[in-house]
């Protein structure tokens, strides 16, 4: 697999919530990433895809909740989020095009 394709597989989607919008004011962007992605891969992918400088990456595993569907208990999938801190003067606007 080429490097560009690997970068697109690393960043699944941006997280657009009230909390992530507040973090964007601090030069931080939140993305959903695969459970197998590590911090180095995430930083490399963000730098390559968005042409910005990354200073730090923090990751969070969000465990899926147990929910009931038609009376049968089921479980939502686990997810992993990455909070990417950008260098001073760099920014990413993930809300354009929505």
Swiss-Prot record:
GO CC, alphabetical: ribonucleoprotein complex; ribosome
GO annotation terms (biological process): translation
UniProt keyword RNA-binding present: yes
Cross-referenced Pfam families: Ribosomal_L23
The keyword rRNA-binding is assigned to this record: yes
SUPFAM superfamilies registered for this protein in UniProt: Ribosomal proteins S24e, L23 and L15e
Protein keywords: Ribonucleoprotein, Ribosomal protein, RNA-binding, rRNA-binding
GO molecular function, one term: rRNA binding
Subunit structure: Part of the 50S ribosomal subunit. Contacts protein L29, and trigger factor when it is bound to the ribosome.
Family from the record: Belongs to the universal ribosomal protein uL23 family.
Matching PANTHER family: 60S RIBOSOMAL PROTEIN L23A
Function: One of the early assembly proteins it binds 23S rRNA. One of the proteins that surrounds the polypeptide exit tunnel on the outside of the ribosome. Forms the main docking site for trigger factor binding to the ribosome.
Protein name stated in the entry: Large ribosomal subunit protein uL23
Lineage: Bacteria, Pseudomonadati, Pseudomonadota, Alphaproteobacteria, Maricaulales
Record gene name: rplW
């Amino acid at each position: 697999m080429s490097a560009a394709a690997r970068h697109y597989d690393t960043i699944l989607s941006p997280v657009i919530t009230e909390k992530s919008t507040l973090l964007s004011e601090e030069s931080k962007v939140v993305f959903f990433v695969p459970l197998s992605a590590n911090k180095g891969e995430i930083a490399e992918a963000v730098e390559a895809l968005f042409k910005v400088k990354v200073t730090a990456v923090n990751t969070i595993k969000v465990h899926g909740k147990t929910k009931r569907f038609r009376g049968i208990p089921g479980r939502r999938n686990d997810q992993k989020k990455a909070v990417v801190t950008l260098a001073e003067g760099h920014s990413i606007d993930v809300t354009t095009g929505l």
